[in-house]
A protein has these predicted regions:
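Low-acidity, Ser/Thr- and Arg-rich intrinsically disordered low-complexity segments
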Residues: 2-18, 28
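Short amphipathic recognition helices of helix-turn-helix/homeodomain-type DNA-binding modules
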Residues: 27-53, 104-151
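An N-terminal domain-cap segment
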Residues: 63-77, 135-148, 154-157
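Recognition helix of helix-turn-helix/homeodomain-like DNA-binding domains
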Residues: 70-73, 79-80, 86-103, 113
Length: 346
């Protein structure tokens, strides 16, 4: 897919202003500042404002147990109604929605979460935003995927398994996982403003999000592309709330927002989610259709990494397809996995 280079003005001041105007409302303030290379204190007020406003807009008075009242200019609850439901003053909630979240107690955050009917993922995201408002960036360490993790993956011989980081980089996989995600490993999406990556270049991490939004093959690999894309963006949004100072993550979000209308629209919705179990459909170029159950878990001994294992119910076409995938995997050379560059999670 051809790249879409971003032409920047020659003056840094003009560049800054135009980029903010372009990205404003799509990427939160911390991410915007990082993308613009303005090093300094990061303010996440815009992110808090947009998240709370988006959650407030989706709840009708009837859903909240309130009388509908008169005509409304915008959908959803009014700020004063959220304040009543949360048991705080209107002025106080208004300040909170404007991003003044520093020092807010857990009890108050929980009350707001209940008033806005946040699910578990959204509640965790709100607390992540509050935490980011009171803490600064911590030193980041580059870690290799531990040998024990790779041995664990390799011991799983009948099920595809991958380990990814918060950027959606596949940082480790077993043989079946490599075979299943072969199209992602083989993707040659060019970097912004550059041509395709030559085969002699240093291997880059296999990134599910870049493949999904920037490589046309992503639409073939994910038959239910719309739903899969929703999940990917929600996972990235969740990770951005957890780690708003992660330069690699914010660069990825900036790239996808600039180059993909599909990503940009989804990012503006502020949806978040926890990704632990479910069923996904795939169309593998060598094997055909697969419908696989997955179990996903965060690796608490390795913060920032997530293990996902895929299985198929016995006596199903997908179970037979996994056997065929294993036979096909045996014919492949293993793709490069630059672990030392990709497992950044501290």
């Amino acid at each position: 897919m051809p790249s879409i280079p971003v032409t920047l003005p020659s003056k840094p001041e003009a560049s800054h202003a135009r980029e903010v105007a372009f990205i404003g409302g799509i990427i939160s303030t911390p991410l915007r500042l990082r993308l613009l290379s303005t090093v300094g204190k990061v303010d996440n007020r815009d992110e808090i404002r947009d998240f709370l406003a988006s959650r407030r807009a989706r709840i009708s008075p009837q859903q909240a147990g309130l009388a509908p009242g008169g005509r409304r200019r915008v959908p959803g609850l009014r700020r004063e109604e959220v304040a009543v439901l949360a048991g705080v003053s209107t002025d106080w909630y208004t300040r909170l929605e404007k991003g003044h979240i520093t020092g807010v107690s857990e009890d108050v955050l929980n009350a707001v979460a209940r008033a806005l009917q946040l699910d578990d993922a959204e509640r965790a995201h709100l607390f992540d935003l509050a935490r980011a408002a009171t803490t600064g960036p911590s030193p980041r360490r580059v870690r290799k995927v531990r040998p024990g993790l790779q041995r664990m993956l390799d011991a799983m011989t009948d099920a595809p398994a991958i380990i990814r980081n918060g950027r959606m980089d596949i940082v480790a996989a077993n043989r079946l996982g490599q075979a299943m995600y072969w199209p992602v490993y083989q993707s040659r999406v060019p970097a912004p403003g550059r041509g395709p990556r030559p085969d002699t270049a240093r291997p880059q991490p296999a990134n599910i999000a870049r493949f999904q939004f920037l490589d046309p093959a992503g639409h073939d690999f994910f038959p239910d592309w719309e739903n899969a894309a929703d999940i990917t963006v929600a996972l990235l949004r969740t990770e951005a709330g957890r780690d708003p100072y992660n330069k690699e993550l914010t660069q990825l979000i900036g790239e996808l927002s600039t180059r993909s209308d599909d990503f940009r629209g989804r990012w503006a919705q502020h949806n978040v989610r926890l990704h632990h179990t479910g069923t996904k459909a795939y169309h593998h170029p060598a094997i055909g259709d697969l419908v696989l159950d997955y179990e996903s878990m965060d690796l608490h001994a390795d913060p920032g990494l997530n293990l996902t294992v895929y299985t198929a119910a016995p006596d199903t076409p997908s179970h037979d397809a996994l056997r065929l995938l294993a036979s096909w995997a045996a014919t492949l050379a293993q793709p490069d996995q630059p672990h030392d560059a990709d497992a950044q999670h501290a």
